[in-house]
């Protein structure tokens, strides 16, 4: 990233962080400081192994997602509902996504390993996601933001099923989801506390937060630990990966 581009991206990511902090919590948006063991409140406007599936050069096909909580329907009524969902996510409560254009600034492109690593490090340097509670709404906001600002097709942000630590399925994305225990007093701070909505979004009922892990640039942990979640791309016999998914209670087709 060049100097001018970095400044522009920095302003854009600051808007992203503010929007994420407001999502499903308004003044209760917050994050967990794991190193200090304290919950921090932020007010609005605050400051590789063998047989690995290739993550680069993949051809994008509409609706071809893994476990992202949303997808891109081809056309018709589903397409209309999808567009309305995106509009609701961006414009809910008359709270516009700061600085995000209606259409992508650049041509759409698939996420690549290098791009994912670069964006991950930049987000970490700017304090973008680290320690922030995860929710499906924040997931979608991040997808929308990357699509509109960077032209990145929203099919890349996928994590292992859990329970426990959820590792990114896209090799190069350096943000994993880590379960945290939230004190009852913090959970009851307000009706839509991000910690409460995170647990309700998760099929295992765990409260998750984003955590930066630079080792994920060199270790494809999601594939090495849970190859069955990659289905036909795992290199495992079909009967084997389906049996493993069934044993873990993970639906498959």
Swiss-Prot record:
Q: Where in the cell is it found?
A: Host cell membrane
| Gene3D superfamilies, A to Z | Nef Regulatory Factor
Which stretches are annotated as coiled coil? Answer: none
Q: Which domain of life is it from?
A: Viruses
Q: Name one GO molecular function term.
A: GTP binding
Q: Where is this region: Acidic?
A: 88-95
| Keyword Lipoprotein recorded | yes
Main location per UniProt?
host cell
Among InterPro entries, the record links this protein to: HIV-1_Nef_core_sf, HIV_Nef
Q: Where is this region: Mediates dimerization?
A: 140-156
A single GO cellular-component term from the record reads: host cell plasma membrane
The listed location of motif PxxP is 104-107
**Listed Pfam families:** F-protein (PF00469)
Record comment regarding domains: The N-terminal domain is composed of the N-myristoyl glycine and of a cluster of positively charged amino acids. It is required for inner plasma membrane targeting of Nef and virion incorporation, and thereby for infectivity.
Role noted for this protein: Factor of infectivity and pathogenicity, required for optimal virus replication. Alters numerous pathways of T-lymphocyte function and down-regulates immunity surface molecules in order to evade host defense and increase viral infectivity. Alters the functionality of other immunity cells, like dendritic cells, monocytes/macrophages and NK cells. One of the earliest and most abundantly expressed viral proteins.
Assembly notes? Homodimer. Interacts with host CD247/TCRZ; this interaction induces down-regulation of cell surface TCR/CD3 complexes.
Which protein is depicted?
A: Protein Nef
Species: Human immunodeficiency virus type 2 subtype A (isolate KR) (HIV-2)
């Amino acid at each position: 990233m060049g100097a001018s581009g970095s400044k522009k991206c920095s302003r854009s990511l600051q808007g992203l962080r503010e929007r994420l902090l407001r999502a499903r919590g308004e003044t209760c948006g917050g994050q967990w400081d794991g190193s200090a063991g304290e919950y921090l409140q932020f007010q609005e406007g605050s400051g590789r192994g063998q047989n690995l599936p290739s993550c680069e050069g993949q051809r994008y096909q509409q609706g071809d997602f893994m476990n992202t909580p949303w997808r891109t329907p081809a056309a018709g009524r589903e397409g209309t509902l999808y567009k309305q969902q995106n509009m609701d996510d961006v414009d809910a409560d008359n709270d516009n996504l700061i600085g995000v254009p209606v259409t992508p600034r650049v041509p759409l492109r698939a996420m690549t390993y290098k791009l994912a690593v670069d964006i991950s490090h930049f987000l970490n340097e700017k304090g973008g996601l680290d320690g922030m509670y995860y929710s499906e709404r924040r997931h979608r906001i991040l997808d929308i933001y990357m699509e509109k600002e960077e032209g990145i097709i929203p099919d890349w942000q996928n994590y292992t099923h859990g329970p426990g630590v959820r590792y990114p399925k896209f090799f190069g994305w350096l943000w994993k989801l880590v379960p945290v225990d939230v004190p009852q007093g913090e959970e009851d701070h307000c009706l839509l506390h991000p910690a409460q909505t995170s647990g309700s979004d998760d099929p295992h009922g765990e409260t998750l937060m984003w955590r930066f892990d630079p080792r994920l640039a060199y270790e494809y942990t999601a594939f090495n630990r849970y190859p069955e979640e990659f289905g036909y791309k795992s290199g495992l016999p079909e009967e084997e990966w389906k049996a493993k998914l069934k044993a873990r209670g993970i639906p498959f087709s």
